[in-house]
Each structure stands twice: as structure tokens, then as C-alpha cells.
Curated annotation (Swiss-Prot):
One of its GO terms (biological process) is response to nickel cation. Ni(2+) binds at residues 79, 90, 92, 98. Its cofactor is Ni(2+). Keywords: DNA-binding, Metal-binding, Nickel, Transcription, Transcription regulation. PANTHER family: NICKEL-RESPONSIVE REGULATOR. Belongs to the transcriptional regulatory CopG/NikR family. HAMAP family: NikR. Binds 1 nickel ion per subunit. This is Putative nickel-responsive regulator. Transcriptional regulator. The keyword Metal-binding applies. NCBIfam families: PRK00630.1 (NF001884), PRK01002.1 (NF002169), PRK02967.1 (NF002815), PRK04460.1 (NF003381). The keyword DNA-binding applies.
Length: 135
């Protein structure tokens, strides 16, 4: 387990009151626990800006399965990025729409390229990416 370091933070009173309300509503046991989560989130967001950093995450997309050639194009793209794709989940949302969740792990630069390539396809209706640090 990593050593815990204590440090002090000075903030405006109203900022602290608002923060305390939020962490109470979310069920945090302490300010320290909430601040640690915020720090981790900030670090992960910053890593997303550094091409050589390694991250893990998921890319989700919704598309119409009956558009000619789209499923094949998505499969081709995924094969091209086999080194960062861990797994893929395919779900039929209704008779027309499919959702895929692609689990990824690797360098930010390559994962961004994969995400951009998928999200730029004409009949992909929505894409979203969620990343985390490999801690």
C-alpha cells in the first residue's frame, strides 16, 4: 500500500460548503477521499493530452446495422487496431440499432486514432470514450 501524505489546503468558505454538500450527497466518508478521487480524475485527464502515456478505457458507439458496408468497415478498423483492443461487446438495441463497447489498453495516441476513425464514420450515430489510468 502506498504511503499517505497529509497536506493542507486553503479555500474560500463558500467553496468548502458547496464541496461538503456534494461529497455528503455522494456518500464520501471524508474530504480526503473525495479530494483523492478528484486528483486521480485530473491526472487521467492530463494523461489524455500526452500521446505516449498508457491508458485503459472503453469506446462505445451506436450505429444502424443495416447500412450497407458499415459493419464490415467497423470490423476492418478494429482488426487494424488489434494491438490496443482487448475485447468488444456487441448488443442489438432494437431491430435497427446496434451498440458496441470496445475495451482498449495502450498508448493515448493510438487510442485517439481509433476513436477518431470510428467516430468519423458516416452512419455511426454516437460515440463516447471513457478512459482511466493504469494504476
Amino acid at each position: 500500500m502506498t504511503k499517505i501524505v497529509r497536506f493542507g489546503v486553503s479555500v474560500e468558505e463558500d467553496l468548502l460548503e458547496n464541496f461538503d454538500k456534494i461529497i455528503e450527497n455522494k456518500g464520501y466518508n471524508s474530504r480526503s477521499e473525495a479530494i483523492r478521487d478528484l486528483m486521480r480524475d485530473y491526472i487521467i485527464k492530463e494523461k489524455w493530452n500526452i500521446k505516449s502515456e498508457k491508458v485503459a478505457g472503453s469506446i462505445s458507439l451506436i450505429y444502424e446495422h443495416d447500412v450497407y458496408g458499415l459493419s464490415e468497415k467497423l470490423t476492418d478498423i478494429q482488426h487494424h487496431y488489434h494491438d490496443v483492443i482487448i475485447s468488444t461487446l456487441h448488443v442489438h438495441l432494437d431491430e435497427k440499432n446496434c451498440m458496441e463497447v470496445i475495451l482498449v489498453r495502450g498508448k493515448v495516441e493510438k487510442i485517439k486514432k481509433l476513436y477518431n476513425e470510428i467516430s468519423s464514420l458516416k452512419w455511426v450515430r454516437h460515440t463516447n470514450i471513457s478512459i482511466t489510468d493504469i494504476i
